[in-house]
Amino acid sequence: MNATVSSAVQSSLPFSGKTAQVDEGTVKPLPRSQKTYLSGSRPDIRVPMREISQSDTPASMGAEKNPPIYVYDTSGPYTDPAIKIDIRAGLAPLREKWIDERGDTEILSGPASIYGRQRLNDPRLAELRFDLKRSPRRARAGANVTQMHYARGGIVTPEMEFIAIRENQRCEHLADQQREMLARQHPGQDFGAFLPRHITPEFVRDEVARGRAIIPANINHPESEPMIIGRNFLVKINANIGNSALSSSIQEEVEKMTWAIRWGGDTVMDLSTGKNIHETREWIIRNSPVPIGTVPIYQALEKVNGKAEDLTWEIFRDTLIEQAEQGVDYFTIHAGVRLAYVPMTAKRLTGIVSRGGSIMAKWCLAHHKESFLYTQFEEICEIMKAYDVSFSLGDGLRPGSIYDANDEAQFAELKTLGELTQIAWKHDVQVMIEGPGHVPMHLIKENMDMQLKYCAEAPFYTLGPLTTDIAPGYDHITSAIGAAMIGWYGTAMLCYVTPKEHLGLPDKDDVKDGIITYKIAAHAADLAKGHPGAQLRDNALSKARFEFRWEDQFNLGLDPDKARQFHDETLPQEGAKLAHFCSMCGPHFCSMKITQDVRDFAASKGVSDQEALEKGMEEKASEFVARGTEIYSKV
C-alpha cells in the first residue's frame, strides 16, 4: 500500500499510541540527495546537511565534473536511511548530554504542573498517551538555564557551535575554479544588518548575548537540533499546525509536522484548540527535530470552557509550567494588549483579529483592568528562565486588513512589546517580537523601522504580511510578496500562510504549499540582503538549466517532485530528460539551445562568441547578395 493511502486509512481509525506509525512519505531521502554530517570540536556535535549530487556536463574534451551542492536541512533524522524512525519511541535526545554536563538542572520526580499530573494519572488516556520514559527537568534553585544567560557569561555552548557550522552551509567546499563561478553573487542591500562571510561560534554567542538572535531550545526538548533566529543569519520560516474542535487527529498533526520539516520548516507552532491538546503536543515534541512553539492562552481557555472572562493567572501559570515541562521551545504571549489600547481598535474595519489578542481584550473589558499577562510578566520570566523557553511576544492588535495597517493600536502595542523585551532581558530570557498581518507594500518598511526603534533589534517574526485582501484561496501568494520584502528589510523569521488561510484548517498538501512558498520568500530575502553564499544554489541550478541537465534542475529545486511532474506531463519519455529543449518552446525556438549553437560554432571557428555572431551575420549577408538580393523568393 502506498504511503498516501496508508496515511489516509490510518487517519480514519481511532488513534492508538501502540500502533502509531510514521508517514512513509517523510522518511525517504529527496532525489539524488543524501544526509551528510559535519563534525564539530567534540564527537557528539554532528551537524546535518543535505548533499545534492549533480551529473557531469558533457564537454568536447571529456566530462566536466559538477560539485555536490550542500543545503540547510530541517528534516532531522527522517531523511537518513541509516536511522530507523519509530514515532512511538520518539527521536534520540541529541542535546541531553550537553544539558546534563552544565550541572544547573535537576530532574523532577514527575510533572510539577497540576494539569500535567491529572493527564498522567487519567487511565482513560492510556491509549493516547506518549510513553515517555524520562521525567521533566527544571533549573536548580537560583539557576538560570537560558542560552542568553550562558552567552552573556561568555560561554560558547555546544548549541552555538552547532549553529555556526550549520549556518555556513559548507560553502568553503568548492574548488577555486568552481567557487569563482558558483559563489559569485550580486551585492545586496542589507539595511544595517551585519552579515559576516564566515560565521563563528563566538559570533553566534555575541548575537545571542546582545538579544539580536535567539536559540529556541527548551531543556525538556533535547531531541531538537539547534537553530538560530536573527536578522544577521539566514531568514527562517515557521509552519503552523494544530487540530480544531471540528477536525484532525493526533496522527494527522504528527504527519503535518514531519511533512513541514521535510520541505523546510525551521520551526513548527502547534496551535491546537480541539481535543486532547496535551497529548497531541507531547507526540509532536517527542518526534520533532525543530523547535516547537505554542500559544498557551488557547489551552488555558479550553480549561475554562471557552469563557475568556473566567481565565485566571493561576490557570495560565499552570499551563505555562505544563507546556514548559513537555518541552515547548517558545511561547506566544500577548502581554502587550493593554486596557487603554482596546478602544483604539473601535474605528477599525476588521477590529481585533488575533485569537490571543481578542481573548485578552475581552478579559480586560470584563474585569476593567490590565491583563494578568502584563501585570505578572516578571513572574512569567521566572518560569521561562527555569526551562529556557523563549518569548514570542504576540501582536494581539495586528491589523486584519490593509485598511487597518499601521494604525495607532498596532504601534502602541509594539511600543509596549519593546518595554517588555527590556524586562525579559533583565532576566536573560530570550525574546522575539511578532508582527503583522495585513500591510500594503508601501507601508511594510515602516513596520520594520518601528520594530527596530522600539524593540532594540530583538528578532522580528511576522505573519506575511499579506499585501492585498482580494485573493481568498491564494493568500499564500499575497503574503509571500510581503514576506519577501520584510525579510529583506530585516525580519528574522516568517510565519507561513497556506492557501487555506481565512477559509479552513490546512491539510498536508496545504502545509507543503505554504512551506515551499515561504522558502521562496525567505531565500529571495537572503539574496536581496546579500547573505554570503545565498546565490550558490541559484547559480548551480541556472548552470544545469543552460546545460539541459534536467535531473539536476529538478533536484536542485525546492520541490523536485513537482518540477519533474510538470516536465513529464508533456514530455514523459525518459529520453526527453536528455533533450536540449522542453515543451515550452520546442526544439527550434529554445533560446538556450540557440545560444549553445552559437558557442559551438564559435568553438569550431576558433573565435569568441561575439565574433561568431558577427561572422554568422556576414555569411548570411553574403548568401543574401549571392541569391540576387530579393526579399521574397519564389518557391
Swiss-Prot record:
Q: What does this protein do?
A: Catalyzes the synthesis of the hydroxymethylpyrimidine phosphate (HMP-P) moiety of thiamine from aminoimidazole ribotide (AIR) in a radical S-adenosyl-L-methionine (SAM)-dependent reaction.
* Molecular function terms, GO-annotated: 4 iron, 4 sulfur cluster binding; carbon-carbon lyase activity; zinc ion binding
Name its co-factor(s): [4Fe-4S] cluster
PANTHER family xrefs: PHOSPHOMETHYLPYRIMIDINE SYNTHASE, CHLOROPLASTIC, THIAMINE BIOSYNTHESIS PROTEIN THIC
Entry's EC annotation: 4.1.99.17
Q: What does the record give as its pathway?
A: Cofactor biosynthesis; thiamine diphosphate biosynthesis
Q: Which InterPro entries match?
A: ThiC, ThiC-associated_dom, ThiC/Bza_core_dom, ThiC/BzaA/B
One GO term under biological process is: thiamine biosynthetic process
Q: Where does Zn(2+) bind?
A: 438, 502
UniProt-listed NCBIfam families: PRK09284.1, PRK13352.1, thiC
The UniProt family comment states: Belongs to the ThiC family.
Q: Any note on cofactor binding?
A: Binds 1 [4Fe-4S] cluster per subunit. The cluster is coordinated with 3 cysteines and an exchangeable S-adenosyl-L-methionine.
Q: Which Pfam families match?
A: ThiC-associated (PF13667), ThiC_Rad_SAM (PF01964)
What is the recorded name of this protein? Phosphomethylpyrimidine synthase
The keyword Protein biosynthesis is assigned to this record: no
Annotated region described as Disordered, given as residue ranges: 1-41
Gene, per the UniProt record: thiC
One GO location term (cellular component):
cytosol
Superkingdom of the organism of origin = Bacteria
Residues bound to substrate are: 240, 269, 298, 334, 354-356, 395-398, 434, 461
Keyword entries, A-Z: 4Fe-4S, Iron, Iron-sulfur, Lyase, Metal-binding, S-adenosyl-L-methionine, Thiamine biosynthesis, Zinc
As its record notes, the protein acts as a catalyst of: 5-amino-1-(5-phospho-beta-D-ribosyl)imidazole + S-adenosyl-L-methionine = 4-amino-2-methyl-5-(phosphooxymethyl)pyrimidine + CO + 5'-deoxyadenosine + formate + L-methionine + 3 H(+)
**Polar residues composition bias: residue spans:** 1-14
Subunit-structure text: Homodimer.
- Looking at the keywords, is Transcription present? no
Q: Which residues bind [4Fe-4S] cluster?
A: 582, 585, 590
